[in-house]
Amino acid sequence: MIDIKKHYYNMGNEDINMMLFGDLHYSDKFNDKKLDLIYNKLKNSEYIFIAGDLLDSTDVVNNIDKRDKLIKFLEKVSKKSKVFITLGNHDLAIRNKHKKAKDDNNEFWLEVSRIDGIFLSRYNNYYEDDKIIVYLLEQDYDYYYKNKHESRELL
């Protein structure tokens, strides 16, 4: 159970420019020109929220060219904006011939979390400035996969 406490803050009357997107599903087959289109949509936002499934599968983590392009995209975006990333089920699991295997891409996400301006749910899940307060939540691997398989066995 998640305990949510109510907090009330007077953050001022300034406008906040933020964007939310999710389910990019970046993969080996992803057309990288789309990253430029996405950047052009995001570049004027102060805060960007990526709500899971940035990756299609963690296979892209092992493709050095694709991995580097995604890292460079995140670095470029985070130079202009604060970027908050919550990991989704595709970000956590490695697909291998239509089967899911336990998460082992921690090195990639640790690298992402070290980019200035990036806040990743796994490593730095709280952010506050004079305009916004952010709490990032992330479900663990078992939430997506273990429980799903156990419930199928009950049927």
Question: What is each model feature region?
Answer:
Residues 118, 130-155:
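Binuclear metal-dependent hydrolase catalytic cores centered on His/Asp/Glu-rich metal-binding motifs
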Residues 1-30:
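Acidic, histidine-bearing metal-coordination/catalytic regions of metal-dependent phosphoesterases
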Residues 5-9, 124-130:
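Short acidic-hydrophobic surface loop/beta-edge motif
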Residues 5-7, 34-37, 70-72, 151-155:
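A generic local structural motif
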Residues 16-18, 46-47, 132-134:
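Structural motif
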